[in-house]
Regions:
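N-terminal Rossmann-like FAD-binding beta1-loop-alpha1 element of flavoenzymes
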Residues: 26-50, 180-186
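Dinucleotide-binding/catalytic capping subdomain of oxidoreductase cores
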Residues: 46-59, 184-328, 406-414
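N-terminal Rossmann-like dinucleotide/flavin-binding domain of flavoprotein oxidoreductases
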Residues: 52, 56, 63-120, 266-286, ...
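Glycine-/small-residue-rich beta->alpha transition segments that form the dinucleotide
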Residues: 120, 124-131, 176-177, 334-347
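Glycine-rich dinucleotide-binding loop and its adjacent helix/turn
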Residues: 130-208, 359-368
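C-terminal, flexible cofactor-proximal segment of oxidoreductases
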Residues: 366, 371-461
Length: 461
């Protein structure tokens, strides 16, 4: 972790008029939902609405496009979730937040640059990398992180256009929504995705997939899953895909009963799972999606450097919803393993970082130095602040907390030397950074939409 004095030195500034005579200059790094919500809440804060304060906000992203994981981390057959983009577009379309795409923090602009041009900086860079699954065999060909697969099927520019989809039987390790997304996309017939925004290369890859069986494994019981009811129910909507569950996986302890009594979402999901359990109709689909509970991964089995199986250990509930191993092992013959055990944030240059949690250390959004002192003017929001937990509602409340603290801290914010908004453009242009603006992105998006439509039309014929 970076020592406090190094970070403080990067923030040294020359005094200039305070924010009683000019707008408060704020940079938000990361143009996903967390960053956009934070910027939006600043513009709608009470000091701004009352006329006490003016704000000037610049939103930065290392990609030419805004929207972060909503654009590159949500399955293409989730139009309802991607509908959030409509709301985010309306925020940026107002014109009171400037967008700078294709600008990378730590490369194109350093911390000292932000310190010279902004009173405060909010980091909203998220958690986009796969948390590791530390078991033997994880290095074998055929083992993939779920985040990488999601990025591929969403057309992320950092990932190859092709993906290895030769496996007939596939394992997905994890019991959260990302695991369900991965399993659903792998098991779904490609032609049923043509009504979505699926990229053409992804459609072609999935179309050629020989998959027949996808297994989802969770180490705890049905009452401890981390899905949401909507995601779970969507599994049953896939054409020509049977849902398969197993009687021996349906165990409930006192903690399970308490969870079902106290949490309606859990009660609804258990009811859905029990309905599938009771369904004894013939399984005639050409593809099957198996849901396994109370099984923990112990080893990826391989031959000649490639995946040939996954060894799972049966677990038992301990009475409080936790589990322990039983010593009973089952080997599943699979040719690919996807691990979806969580996301992890990455270290940002010149900032402290908690490697274990994958977050910027902070106190309710105020960035902390190694010794626990507050680094005035630096803030965090979203998953880089709290870790990869919570949906859009949590992201909004999280952003509000950070913004409120930023506004409270105004008397403590260091002065800056270049308050003129145009000075940031001048720096980027002087360094040869080809940044995109909101207007430029709209033109790019319109072109991509037209290109995608013509591609879908051709594939559908």
């Amino acid at each position: 972790m970076m020592r406090a004095e190094h970070t403080a030195r990067a923030l040294e500034r020359n005094p200039v008029a305070d924010t009683t005579t000019r707008p408060l200059r704020v940079a938000v790094i990361g143009a996903g939902p967390a960053g956009i919500y934070a910027a939006d809440m600043l513009t709608k804060s009470e000091p701004v609405k009352s006329g006490e304060l003016e704000v000037s906000i610049d939103l930065f992203d290392r990609y030419p496009t805004p929207f972060g994981l909503i654009r590159y981390g949500v399955a293409p057959d989730h139009p309802r979730i991607k509908g959030i983009i409509t709301a985010l577009r309306s925020i940026l379309g107002r014109g009171d937040i400037r967008f700078f795409g294709n600008v990378e923090y730590g490369k194109d602009l350093m911390l000292a640059d932000f310190g010279a041009h902004y009173d405060a900086v909010i980091f909203a860079t998220g958690a986009v990398y796969d948390a590791p699954l530390n078991i033997p065999g994880i290095e074998l060909e055929g083992v993939h992180g779920a985040a990488e697969f999601v990025a591929w099927y969403d057309g992320h520019p950092d990932f190859p256009r092709t993906w290895p989809l030769e496996a007939r039987e596939v394992a997905v390790v994890g019991n959260g929504n990302v695991a369900l997304d991965v399993a659903r996309v792998l098991s779904k017939h490609a032609d049923d995705m043509l009504v979505t925004e699926i990229p053409g290369n992804v459609y072609q890859g999935l179309k050629a997939s020989p998959v027949t069986d996808v297994h989802i494994f969770g180490r705890r019981g049905p009452a401890q899953v981390k899905f949401t009811p909507l995601e779970l129910r969507e599994l049953a909507k896939s054409r020509d895909v049977d849902i398969v569950v197993y009687d021996e996986d349906f165990q409930y302890d006192e903690g399970s009963e308490q969870a079902m009594a106290e949490n309606n979402q859990i009660k609804v999901m258990v009811k859905t799972l029990e309905k599938w359990r009771a369904d004894d109709s013939p399984k005639t689909a050409s593809r099957r999606l198996h849901l396994h509970f109370l099984q923990s991964p112990r080893e990826v089995l391989g031959e000649d450097g490639k995946v040939v199986g996954l060894r799972m250990e049966r677990t038992r509930l301990n009475g409080d919803g936790s589990v322990s191993g039983t010593g009973e092992y089952v080997d599943y013959p699979v040719q690919a393993v996807y691990h979806a055990v969580g996301y992890h944030g990455s270290r940002l240059p010149e900032l402290p970082f908690d490697e274990a949690r994958g977050v910027i250390p902070n106190a309710e959004g105020r960035v902390l130095a190694e010794d626990g002192t507050v680094l005035h003017g630096l803030y965090a929001t979203g998953w880089i602040k709290r870790g990869p937990v919570g949906l859009i509602g949590a992201t909004k409340s999280d952003a509000l907390e950070t913004v409120n603290h930023l506004l409270e801290d105004r008397p403590l914010l260091p002065p800056l030397s270049h308050p003129d908004p145009q000075s940031v453009n001048d720096v980027l242009e002087a360094r040869g950074v080809e940044y995109t603006t909101w207007e430029g992105w709209l033109a790019l998006d319109e072109y991509e939409q037209a290109l995608g439509q013509s591609s879908h039309d051709a594939e559908g014929n």
